[in-house]
């Protein structure tokens, strides 16, 4: 399990992940192709939430999270 906080990023390999937030936040990804971070479709959480999502190999980052955290498993 990986926990990230506001404006922190972590690299993930391609696969299916469970993402669990403790509250409102926005999840972004960067493929390393020079386009920079982009918001994941349905990656804007307005409350605590758990989702299952398939991701490519990328860097994940959360923004607009305040004190909220994201757990990746």
Q: Where do the model's predicted regions map?
A:
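Acidic, Ser/Thr/Pro
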Residues: 1-73
